């Protein structure tokens, strides 16, 4: 109880301070996002779980809605997300997932200008493979999926299922905005799968570009991952 009360405020301040210490040297194709928001009134941001640390603050500042697990860990994550500026619906692939996804879809339909943020391969993978939930949301709302990726010149890479990483404080960061992807409302199962693979491929290309920006390797190596070139 004490952790749930004190942890999220401290955690939110720490995340914001950490990311604000970094310097965004490139924010590529931001006009794609701005144009989609102006034209369609909302969007579905998609990134990999591996890249989520930066987007805790980036998506939070956009006040996007995320699906967060109803587990005990999810209670803490939800409190932290609210502190960072997110809205949330509660559910996961293993518990209450369909209901939460339907709730998110209805929310996006009703609120002009509302946005969703998806850790598109989370919470347990397989890594860097888009799950069908993002496709379903796009199909039923008519909103575009906008892939978002970031890379850091210096980072800490963990031995997790997806090699989750953190940018080191004071490092340079690059943020890439992908081309919007639409899913027709009459798309059948075959077309949805084609689009799922298309978005997956585009997101992985973006992630690899971020990693190669300063000469790094795709996914990185566990430990302190420093650039091959400065």
Predicted region positions:
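Alpha-helical membrane-targeting segments
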Residues: 1-21, 76, 83, 98, ...
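Membrane-anchoring hydrophobic helices of lipid-metabolizing enzymes
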Residues: 1-61, 105, 201-230
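Residue-level preference for the first positions of well-ordered beta-strands
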Residues: 42-44, 63, 113-117, 146
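Catalytic core of membrane glycerolipid acyltransferases/transacylases, capturing the structured
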Residues: 42-96, 141, 157
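Short, charged beta->alpha transition segments
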Residues: 74-78, 100-108
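Active-site and donor-binding regions of nucleotide-sugar-utilizing enzymes
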Residues: 95-99, 127, 153
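Catalytic-site beta-strand/loop segments enriched in glycine and acidic/polar residues
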Residues: 104-141
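A cross-family acyltransferase "interaction/gating" segment
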Residues: 130-189
